[in-house]
Structures are given as C-alpha cells and as structure tokens.
Swiss-Prot record:
Name of the molecule in the record: Gag polyprotein
Modification after translation (UniProt): RNA-binding phosphoprotein p12 is phosphorylated on serine residues.
Residue ranges the record marks as coiled coil: 448-470
Stored Gene3D superfamilies: Gamma-retroviral matrix domain, Human Immunodeficiency Virus Type 1 Capsid Protein, Zinc finger, CCHC-type
Residues flagged as site, Cleavage: Y129, P130, F214, P215, L477, A478
Motif (LYPX(n)L motif): 128-132
Segments of this protein annotated with the region Interaction with host UBE2I: 429-434
Annotated stretches, region: Disordered: 112-217, 433-537
Any GO BP: viral budding via host ESCRT complex
Organismal lineage: Viruses, Riboviria, Pararnavirae, Artverviricota, Revtraviricetes
Record GO terms (molecular function): RNA binding; structural constituent of virion; zinc ion binding
Pfam families on file: Gag_MA, Gag_p12, Gag_p30, zf-CCHC
Length: 537
C-alpha cells in the first residue's frame, strides 16, 4: 500500500463541510471547484510565495489578501470569499488543521539553536517587518564577553547608541570567568551566541517569513535595545500603499500595525510620518492627535501643559528603558493613531455613499466592504455600530445590482433580516446569475423567436385578408346572379295569359301580334344583351 501526501489543499477538500461552515461564519460562500482553481492556479501567480498545494502561513495569506483587495483593475473581487476563508482557517485553525500549523514564535528571547549549516539563499522578507541580512564583508571579530551560565551574548562594540537616554550596561552581572574570542582575518564560524548579534545573525528557518527586528526589543540581560527602521522597509511601505489623501483607511491600518508590532520611539514615529505623509497631511494628523488628549477628568482638554506633556511637538526626554518612559510612548502612539483616524474622515457627504453601486461582476461581499469604507470616509458614522446596521442594510439593498436588489426587497420578513442574512442571500443570487455567454445566447434565442412570431403573424394576416376578399367577392357574385334570376322570373309573372286568337301586342282578339295593325313597321334593331359580372371585374 502506498502512502498519500497530505497537503493544505487536500486537507481542506477532505473537510469541505467544515470549510463551508467557516465560510458561512464569515458571511461568505465558497465552491469547491473555484477553491481548487484559485489555490492551485491563480494565487501562485501573484509572486508572494503561495505554493500550488496551499499553505496555512498567515504572512503569505495576508500578502495574497492584499493582492485580492487591491483597488482598481488590479483587484480580484471574485476571490475575496476564498482568501477570507483561508485566513480564518489559518488564524483560528480547527482541530484537523492544528497539526499542520507551525507554532507561533515567542517575542521573548530564547536559547539559540545551532544551525545545521550556512544557508545559501537569503532569508525571505516580510512586507511589513524590517529584516537584516547577514553581512558578507570580512572583518575581524570583536572581543566578546561570554557568561558561565550559558545566557545570551550581547556584542557591545557592534551595537548602535540609542537615540536618546543612556542605556545601562548590557553585560551580565557576576565575577565569573571571562573568555575572549580570538581575532582572525576570516569570518568566524557560526555559533549559538553569534546568532544573537546584530549583523551576524543566521537566516531564519525555512518556514519562518516574519522578521523579529523591532525598534524596541528585549536584549540578553532583559533590557530594551533600539533597532531602527530600515530604509528599504520605509521605501516599500510608501510605494506599495496609496497616499493618505487617496485612501486614509488603508494607510491608517498599515501605520496601526507598525505601531503595534514595532513599538517605535518618538523619533521613529516622526520618521514614519515624514515618509508616508505629506507635510500638510502630517500637520493635520498632529493637530487631530492633540485634540484627542484627555485631562485628569477623562474629557478632552486644551490646557497647553497637559497637551504638550501627552503629545509633544518637540523631541521629549523620554527614556524607553524606564516604565515611565514606556508609558509615555504607549500614550503617544495611541493619540497618534486617534489623530490618523480623525484626520482621515472627510466632511459628511451622503451623496458619495449613495454613489457606491455594485459592479456587474462584483461579489456582494466586496461591494459591502466598499460601502462600509464609504461610510467611514464620508460620514461620521461607524458601519460596524449595531445602531447603524439598518442604514447600512438599506443602502446595501438599494445600491446592489438591480437583479439582486429586487429579489432582496421581496424577501419575507425583511425587517428581521440582519446584514449577514442579506449578504448570504445576495451571494446565492450572485452565484446563480447567468454568464455573459449565456446572456448572449438568451438574447439571440429571444430575437429569433420574436422574428419567427412576427413572420407567422404576417402570414396569418395575409391569409385572413385573402379569405375576407374571397368571401366579399362570393357575396357580390351571388347577389348579381340572384338579381338576374329574379328579373327573369318577375318578367314571366307579369306577362298576362293570352287567348288563342288574342294579340300579344295590343291585347285585342281576332289577330296575332305579327299581324297587329297597331304595331309599328320597320327594321328590327339588335336585341340588347345582358352582361354578367365576372370575378375579373
């Protein structure tokens, strides 16, 4: 008996019922044939590392999702339900997926593992986190301090100084024996401790695509170390995302993820805003962030001292190595995020919301996302608020495609339907719609049937006219013949009975008509002929 290889794609097909249930929980519907097509043929062409057999790697799934949700002609609205379902399976894996999902790496430092050998390929780069590649330029190794207890090693000579504040000593305490590494002209062989050093770290494992380089990161002795943003990541973030004025929601989501995962300092935040925003956009964001500062009573305040203390415009003297400094940075990042959200809201314009209509080939789920984004951008209302669900539902019905909107309006007990119920019904209608080829065939068939009915009607009317003309002519001929017959019969009845010796001309007795003295004598004229009406006349 041979063994079959289990892949993520085959695993989902074996548990297709669970996949459909997960998709239903996401208010979308999926079909097995399109599931296989997108996984094995479409997504591998996006160039983000998606294998033909599928994967449960969240980083790759998110990159495919960004391609699918791309605005304009580069997006793939028909693939939205399928990548959303993949993401849900990988984010909250069911029992049959958990054995195939690699455990999430912890952010805290762990004991390094001796690599099996140097990797010949560069480490994969994430679209979000900055990563550092090992240096290939030979240089003499620096003196390193080793600890007896096998703790992680920090290279003090290669660490950059922090942007502000004094950093405490990074060497472990204790008066144990110290060893000094020998200097050579070649790059030292990899070791467990060297893998901790910046610029000399080994490439991550093959199944890891997430960089662990954060601006603030715990060092070997439990103290935070500073890791600045790389220029390549800043460049990629700027070029692979729309401007703040064009799509504030997408850029705000990117900055929010950076603020959450990277824990940037005040200087890092200014660098991030200066790279991703224009000067006018940055000033608007900073102004809205300062408006969001709250006083001791929990209400917004305009006191300059409190505003400058929570959200300073000048470089503060916060020390991120102390709890107080970290608390200041956390509050600053929260206010900055609030400023981004408030500055991204356009003036209320319901006409813009009403102008969002469903495209001919756009799925209801993708249309709903565009509609919600319009609510966030052009109104002060939150479409996720339960109090706004009725307004969003009505907009979804009225602005859907005409065929979908008419059927949604005729649903029974429409008032009790939730927005999720409407989306599911719309998906059913959308999936049953006719293709362009079927529509052309239907129109051609209807045109032929209409032309055939027109020809049949013309022939029927022509036959009816011929029959009516025939009947009229027959009636006219019958009338003429009947009149002539009556004339002949009438003349015979008017002729009186004559005796044998009575004249037919003068009605006197004693002679006949040919010998009647009263009858004029002369040549007889031609007898008039009776003309009969024929069909040709």
């Amino acid at each position: 008996m041979g063994q079959t290889v289990t892949t993520p794609l085959s695993l989902t097909l074996e548990h297709w019922g669970d996949v459909q249930r997960i998709a239903s929980n996401q208010s979308v519907g999926v079909k097995k044939r399109r599931w296989v097509t997108f996984c094995s043929a479409e997504w591998p062409t996006f160039g983000v590392g998606w294998p033909q057999d599928g994967t449960f790697n969240l980083d790759i799934i998110l990159q495919v999702k960004s391609k699918v949700f791309s605005p304009g002609p580069h997006g793939h609205p028909d693939q939205v339900p399928y990548i959303v379902t993949w993401e849900a399976i990988a984010y909250e894996p069911p029992p049959w997926v958990k054995p195939f999902v690699s455990p999430k790496l912890s952010l805290s430092p762990t004991a390094p593992i001796l690599p099996s050998g140097p990797s010949t390929q560069p480490p994969p780069r994430s679209a979000l986190y900055p990563a550092f590649t090992p240096s290939i330029k030979p240089r003499p190794s620096k003196p390193q301090v080793l600890s007896d207890d096998g703790g992680p090693l920090i290279d003090l000579l290669t660490e950059d100084p922090p942007p502000y504040g004094e950093q405490g000593p990074s060497s472990p305490d204790g008066d144990g024996d110290r060893e000094e590494a020998t200097s050579t002209s070649e790059i030292p062989a990899p070791s467990p401790m060297v893998s901790r050093l910046r610029g000399k770290r080994d490439p991550p494992a093959a199944d890891s695509t997430t960089s662990r380089a954060f601006p603030l990161r715990l060092g070997g002795n439990g103290q935070l170390q500073y890791w600045p943003f790389s220029s390549s990541d800043l460049y990629n973030w700027k070029n692979n995302n729309p401007s703040f004025s064009e799509d504030p929601g997408k850029l705000t989501a990117l900055i929010e993820s950076v603020l959450t995962t990277h824990q940037p300092t005040w200087d890092d935040c200014q660098q991030l805003l200066g790279t991703l925003l224009t000067g006018e956009e940055k000033q608007r964001v900073l102004l809205e962030a300062r408006k969001a500062v709250r006083g001791n009573d929990g209400r917004p305040t305009q006191l300059p001292n409190e505003v400058n203390s929570a959200f300073p415009l000048e470089r503060p003297d916060w020390d991120y190595t102390t709890p107080e400094g970290r608390n200041h940075l956390v509050l600053y990042r929260q206010l900055l995020l609030a400023g981004l959200q408030n500055a991204g809201r356009s003036p209320t314009n319901l006409a813009k919301v009403k102008g969002i209509t469903q495209g001919p080939n756009e799925s209801p789920s993708a249309f709903l996302e565009r509609l919600k984004e319009a609510y966030r951008r052009y109104t002060p209302y939150d479409p996720e608020d339960p109090g706004q669900e009725t307004n969003v539902s009505m907009s979804f019905i009225w602005q859907s495609a005409p065929a979908i909107g008419r059927k949604l309006e005729r649903l029974e007990d429409l008032k009790s339907k939730t927005l999720g119920d409407l989306v599911r019904e719309a998906e059913k209608i959308f999936n049953k719609r006719e293709t362009p080829e079927e529509r052309e065939e239907r129109i051609r068939r209807e045109t032929e049937e209409k032309e055939e009915r027109r020809r049949a009607g013309d022939e029927q009317r022509e036959k009816e006219r011929d029959r009516r003309r025939q009947r009229e002519m027959s009636k006219l001929l019958a009338t003429v013949v009947t009149g002539q017959r009556q004339d002949r019969q009438g003349g015979e009845r008017r002729r009186p009975q004559l005796d044998k010796d009575q004249c037919a001309y003068c009605k006197e007795k004693g002679h006949w008509a040919k010998d009647c003295p009263k009858k004029p004598r002369g040549p007889r004229g031609p007898r008039p002929q009776t003309s009969l009406l024929t069909l040709d006349d």
